[in-house]
Design a protein with these regions (language model features):
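Catalytic strand-loop segment that frames the active site of acyl-thioester-processing enzymes
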Residues: 2-7, 17-56, 70
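Generic structural detector for well-ordered beta-strands
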Residues: 37-43, 88, 147-151
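Active-site helix/loop of acyl-thioester processing domains in fatty-acid/polyketide metabolism
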Residues: 57-77
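Short, structured beta-strand/loop micro-motifs enriched in basic residues and often containing a Trp
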Residues: 78-85
Length: 153
């Protein structure tokens, strides 16, 4: 007669094949047309050129911020920027502007998200009315556009 082993054994995780419900693409909330938007004031500390002009890198950094939120919302991860394409600086951004930055998903891959980005100036100082005078712009001015790809785990 043989005795069964009485030594404790480690529980094993069930092994199930990857299914549509467990793949990264199935867990994502990323959908074409999903849009995220930020608004921010452009501080005078970012002016680098005559006339309080802000460099184009300011827009690219803002695109990175809105893309990070998009990845957190859709995939629960900050993601990583892989590339930019078709970056266009269409109008100036100056210190004191209020800008709106948007990202819209245009393609969803298994681990990648392609987005269209836009910075619009929605408010601007009006020095003619006074040193601290400002006004909202209607319509807003499109300042920077780009397309970018982020990857998520």
């Amino acid at each position: 007669m043989t005795d069964a082993s009485t030594e404790p054994t480690e529980p094993t995780a069930p092994t199930t094949p990857a299914t549509a419900s467990t793949t990264p693409a199935a867990r994502t909330k990323a959908k074409v047309g999903l849009r995220i938007m930020h608004r921010r004031y452009v501080p005078y500390g970012h002016a680098h050129y005559a006339g309080n002009l802000v460099d184009g890198a300011y827009s690219l950094a803002a695109f990175g911020d809105v893309a990070t939120e998009m990845c957190i919302v859709t995939d629960g991860d900050e993601g990583l920027f892989a590339s930019y394409s078709d970056v266009q600086f269409r109008s100036r951004i100056t210190a004191g502007d209020v800008i709106e930055i948007s990202a819209e998903i245009i393609r969803v891959g298994t681990r990648s998200r392609e987005m269209d980005f836009e910075v619009r100036v929605v408010g601007r100082g009006n020095q003619e009315r006074g040193a601290s005078a400002a006004e909202m712009l209607d319509p807003p001015i499109v300042a920077t556009t780009a397309r970018g790809v982020v990857v998520v785990p």
